[in-house]
Curated annotation (Swiss-Prot):
It holds the Pfam family Cpn60_TCP1. GO terms for molecular function: ATP binding; ATP hydrolysis activity; ATP-dependent protein folding chaperone; unfolded protein binding. This is T-complex protein 1 subunit zeta 1. The gene is CCT6A. InterPro entries: Chap_CCT_zeta, Chaperone_TCP-1, Chaperonin_TCP-1_CS, Cpn60/GroEL/TCP-1, GroEL-like_apical_dom_sf, GROEL-like_equatorial_sf, TCP-1-like_intermed_sf, TCP-1_chaperonin. It comes from Arabidopsis thaliana (Mouse-ear cress). PANTHER family: CHAPERONIN. It is found in: Cytoplasm. Belongs to the TCP-1 chaperonin family. Keywords: ATP-binding, Chaperone, Cytoplasm, Nucleotide-binding. Heterooligomeric complex of about 850 to 900 kDa that forms two stacked rings, 12 to 16 nm in diameter. GO terms for biological process: response to zinc ion. The lineage of its organism: Eukaryota, Viridiplantae, Streptophyta, Embryophyta, Tracheophyta.
Amino acid sequence: MSVRVLNPNAEVLNKSAALHMTINAAKGLQDVLKSNLGPKGTIKMLVGGSGDIKLTKDGNTLLKEMQIQNPTAIMIARTAVAQDDISGDGTTSTVIFIGELMKQSERCIDEGMHPRVLVDGFEIAKRATLQFLDTFKTPVVMGDEPDKEILKMVARTTLRTKLYEGLADQLTDIVVNSVLCIRKPQEPIDLFMVEIMHMRHKFDVDTRLVEGLVLDHGSRHPDMKRRAENCHILTCNVSLEYEKSEINAGFFYSNAEQREAMVTAERRSVDERVQKIIELKNKVCAGNDNSFVILNQKGIDPPSLDLLAREGIIALRRAKRRNMERLVLACGGEAVNSVDDLTPDCLGWAGLVYEHVLGEEKYTFVEQVKNPHSCTILIKGPNDHTIAQIKDAVRDGLRSVKNTLEDECVVLGAGAFEVAARQHLINEVKKTVQGRAQLGVEAFANALLVVPKTLAENAGLDTQDVIISLTSEHDKGNIVGLDLQDGEPVDPQLAGIFDNYSVKRQLINSGPVIASQLLLVDEVIRAGRNMRKPT
């Protein structure tokens, strides 16, 4: 009532109404996303306001693209998107886990239990589950020569949840090899050094890994070569065109001759820079059939392009800054900001540089490089929907391999961890908890089963039969997951189904925290400043 006195237009939901609104919002968001989970999950079609269509089963993409208005659902969506930003996967799992925690809590609250008691039980269960996760994980040695088979299994598990099996298996090698290509000992892995380029032609199975760089533009001079072998690569950030000064300066002249002299001086300055590059080319290419390629971040004007073309030099201008970094890592050499004191040590090397024309688009390939630490995943597909799906899957696959290398451990997948953690909480942890907080632990434990239940449901299996068979196997001491083909228990290690440790840890950490905060909401007040204005 006090809020109504201060603001008669305020909208207030009290106690049980606020709690049920919160729980229903969490359950509603769970129902939207749960059919996407796992290899057998379905695809959602998002239609934008302008009629554009997006097909995806990636939870992160769905939550970012959907227009969510309910405040509770917005809060859960932000948590799930943060999960993806931190660990690269687990968005859908986070949403359905929070939704299931709220659903389990609703049963207890309807029987008269106070939410605070449930929250205390959640906290106990969360700590116990995190401790259990540290004992359940499988250590993996990731030294200078990491185990590629484990990395492939992790990548395959992730990719199969986004794409059909044949394409996922093909992309597995591409994703693993690209991460190992950019990996340097004792340095963090920078996934931005993997360029993801797409070309809309051919089929999705034509996607390939280029150990080098693919640029989305070509040369701007008709007389320049379209293909060159044994190339010296000059990476530079030098203006080879007339440009205005960065400060407010002006030129003053009293007659036409002075103006012409100024124009000639400006042109001479640019030509001198070009000439220094040509001198370096003549120095390194004399007496052999090597070629010379310039990739410049700044502009090159037509007269300069003409001079370079006469010398047989391939020149590309306006390259992206990120590609300059990738080029140095792929080809070697160093990026230069001045043409003064150019030496052969500044140059990189590529065995092959060629231009590919696709319709009105031009692409330049830099391949056959030595010891590359940057690469390009070239995605191909017949339409934009296919390309977008592959892009989302590849990004998640790259993150999963990176997480495995950094965690140096994996977690058995196919729902094995969730079932094992649930049995641990029910059979061991619950007995040590005093009072009604036991019910909070039990609700948390049952909520963990939402992952294997949803996997079974999406595969068209009977969820009750699946859970009974899995829990009975775990009670016998066998760690098993769910085989989605026949619904039988399967050893995830033999089947090669592994999840990321960091993804599971983040899921167990964030899910109960958000659920606890939502359960303790006893009043929803809509009384912002804009509501005070008379209508």
